[in-house]
Amino acid sequence: MALTPKQRKVRRDYLTRKKRTLQQQGASNAEIKAFMGGRWNFAGMSDKALERAYDEIKSKGRTQVFGNHVYTSDYVKKAKAWYGDKFSVEKLTQGFRSSQRSELNRFHSVKEVKEYRSERDREAKERYIQALEEMHYNTRDAGNKAQEKAFKSMISRIRRMSASNFGAFLTGGRSDKVSFDNVMVFVDTDGKETAFEFQDSLAREILDNVDKFSKQFVSDMRRRKKRGKK
């Protein structure tokens, strides 16, 4: 069905206005063209092509520009939900096309992202405790009562952490200072692929550091709460 002159003008003006807005916000021409589906000049387009371009761009919703890159607001919200307080512009994929290939797009909403993170952290916590308990079982014959008591206290402290706090505990900014940077946890909640890699070479080092780190983590959380009340 052919567009009326008014419909044609509305669609062309919308596309042109969107392009100019992105330019004013600092997006590069290459990024804008990628966002516009490879289109640049909307004059002379057939009604069918114009309608398709209009529907496609409008369906992408609101946009945000970081640096000279274009992202949909929906993608940015999901990225912020995924990284939490660790979010920074550098965490975003570099460019609109890359963002469209991001794993975050498998989530339909911010709620789904948060639910996935919660489930991932919960499973990671359970698997981590299991690995520590297995290590404790294999080493308890040494007969060191003080070490065994400290070990149980450490596991108890981890158990009391919420799943989200455990996620911060395992991957937090201080983790590299206590050698957790080489402990990798990956959990895919769909059950198809679940992996836990616990490096034996780090076992003793982790034993020495986890108690210190958990205490530091609790201290940091208290300090953060006090700052929040001011």
From Swiss-Prot:
Q: Does the keyword Ion transport apply?
A: no
Entry superkingdom: Viruses
* Alphabetized UniProt keyword annotations: Covalent protein-DNA linkage, DNA replication, Host nucleus, Virion
TM segment ranges: none
Q: Does Coiled coil show up as a keyword for this record?
A: no
Q: Which GO terms describe its biological process?
A: DNA replication
Function comment: DNA terminal protein is linked to the 5'-ends of both strands of the genome through a phosphodiester bond between the beta-hydroxyl group of a threonine residue and the 5'-phosphate of the terminal deoxyadenylate. This protein is essential for DNA replication and is involved in the priming of DNA elongation.
Descriptive protein name: Terminal protein
